[in-house]
Amino acid sequence: MEKLPRKRVSKTKSQKLINSLTTQKNRALLKKISSNEMLLELEKGAFKKNEAYFISDEEDKNYVLVPDNVISLLAENARKAFEARLKAELERDIIIQAPIDFEDVREVSLQLLENLRQKDGNLPNINTLNFVKQIKKEHPNLFFNFDNMFKQPPFNENNFENFDSNDEENF
């Protein structure tokens, strides 16, 4: 599939497009003329650039026609939203793993995440909790280790056998 050009849409054009999508003011009927020809007949509205068109065919299937730059913009916004969600989940899972310095762990994780970026420029959909656990395993110095912090040696009675009353004063 051919990559669509990346054109920015101005705010007024965006507003017109959104308005045309919400009002559905541009309606057309798609009629089959021959096996390889179709006729698009405008029933309502007018043909204007940067507006959406709601099309019905003879079998009552509905379609929406939008300019190609709008599709590119929608795809870019979807990609940005996915990356924002992925980074938010990553930050949540970093906090769960008790980092010593959140910003340090965040930077390490973002660098490792960028290394996973695919050839098409997208980040893969990963399990962020497992990703952070792997970072914790490879870089334990970045996280608190509560197991060792609160571990006490097991109680041993032999440690108190040589206890005499003079030692009691030292307590």
Curated annotation (Swiss-Prot):
Organism superkingdom: Bacteria
Family of the protein in this entry:
Belongs to the UPF0763 family.
Q: What is this protein called?
A: UPF0763 protein Hac_0849
